[in-house]
Amino acid sequence: MMRPDKAATLDRHQTAVAAGGLKAMMPVRRPFLDFVLTVIADAGFEEICLVIGPDRGAIRDYYQQDAKPRRFTLSFAHQEKPRGTADAVLAAEAFAGPDHFLVVNSDTYYPVQALRALHLLGEPGIAGFWKSALIAEGNLSAERVARFPVIEMDAQGILTRLLEPEDAPAPPPDGDVLVSLNCWMFTRTIFRACREIAPSRSGELELPEAVRYAVARLGERMRVLPFREGVLDLTSRSDVASVAARLAGQQVRL
């Protein structure tokens, strides 16, 4: 279910989608996920897998019947229970095969430059986004950006630490830091990490913790690609109007 907001104004269809918890299918002229899939295809990806829950057949039906993609092949993996983002990654293990693969949120519209750079990277990596650009160029408030994990890297641009905000050191004088919005290029090493980490306090398997484990325990080297770009995030009902306005001129090409 989308985060409630009494000040948000939604039409009847949008209200029904928000209540049903299908954030990615929020109608903003077209389902939001149409735009997400379009930009992933624009970045050069030709095989895409959506991880869905057992009660999310409407998503599968939509893309198999109403909006069948032509630019890429679309597969579905099933997460039996909502046990966290690392568990969702495990659900797609059979799809991933032996190659590098992209992992992103379905409720975030990332800049094509970031996705294309990861596609061309040829090694594990993370797209890091400067806090100032997220606030200035996307639809995220400073309060929300402050909750994202902070990225630290060495002089060679390799990820050294992924810190929760409460564990991060004081920011530099300008307050700008690189943060993670779950935009990754992984190898199969991540599956071992996802299986071996302990659940969080909420009982979920969290992807940031799996990344920390892969780096610290399994020797995975992850290249950090910094971007001064904004994203469009569809977390709460109050995001719908701003996201719809930003996507008004964008074309969907599935």
Regions inferred by a protein language model and the residue ranges of each:
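Short helix-capping segments at alpha-helix termini
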Residues: 66-72
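Conserved core of the sugar-phosphate nucleotidyltransferase
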Residues: 111-188, 192, 197
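A structural signal for short hydrophobic beta-strand segments in well-ordered beta-sheet cores
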Residues: 25, 151-153, 224
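Short aromatic/hydrophobic "clamp" motif used to bind/position activated sugar donors
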Residues: 101
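Glycine-rich, basic loop-to-helix element that forms the pyrophosphate-binding segment
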Residues: 84-91
